[in-house]
Design a protein with these regions (language model features):
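Conserved active-site-proximal phosphate/metal-binding subdomains
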Residues: 1-9, 14-164
Length: 164
């Protein structure tokens, strides 16, 4: 609409130099790295959140709307699983009225809410990359590694160019 080139920022699954290089080679102007930075020394994430990311496997996170009414990918647990598998119609009904499902639970349970429900009703946000992010580093080390490895991948790709 401005006549200027559109800038594309790639996001989702960006966690190492190979994924940065792939996004750039596919035409992205930049990348957005999310989950990888949860497991850094400087992250403001609580230790429990960092541990949830560090120990996540490929099937340990789920996309849900129970926390905000908008899709989030979070570490799965029995509380979330119960909503998604047994209370899907209730999610639809509540969100159609603008009611956040988790807040609805808190209102209904009131002072009767138990510690386990409280603990499991806390979302540990993470993307699919959490399954391969398992080492805590400084943010600088992460950025340095992303850039260094991306440059290596791009240079390796240049060597593969056919000479016509």
């Amino acid at each position: 609409m401005t006549g200027k080139p559109v800038q594309v920022v790639a996001a989702g699954g960006i966690y190492n130099g190979r994924t940065v290089a792939a996004a750039l080679m596919l035409g992205a102007s930049a990348v957005w790295v999310g989950t990888r930075f949860i497991l850094t020394d400087e992250a403001g994430a609580p230790k429990a959140h960092q541990e949830a990311v560090r120990t996540a496997g490929h099937d340990d996170n789920i996309r849900t709307i129970i926390f905000t009414g908008r899709p989030l990918r979070v570490r799965n647990n029995k509380y979330i699983e119960n909503w998604e598998e047994n209370r899907a119609a209730e999610i639809k009904e509540l969100t159609a009225k603008g009611v956040i499902p988790v807040e609805h639970d808190f209102e209904i349970l009131g002072d009767e809410i138990d510690d386990e429900t409280m603990d499991n009703a806390r979302p540990f946000l993470m993307g699919k990359a959490a399954a391969v992010v398992n080492e805590k580093k400084s943010a600088k080390a992460v950025v340095d590694e992303l850039v260094t490895d991306a440059v290596k991948c791009i240079h390796n790709g240049e060597r593969m160019t056919a000479k016509l």
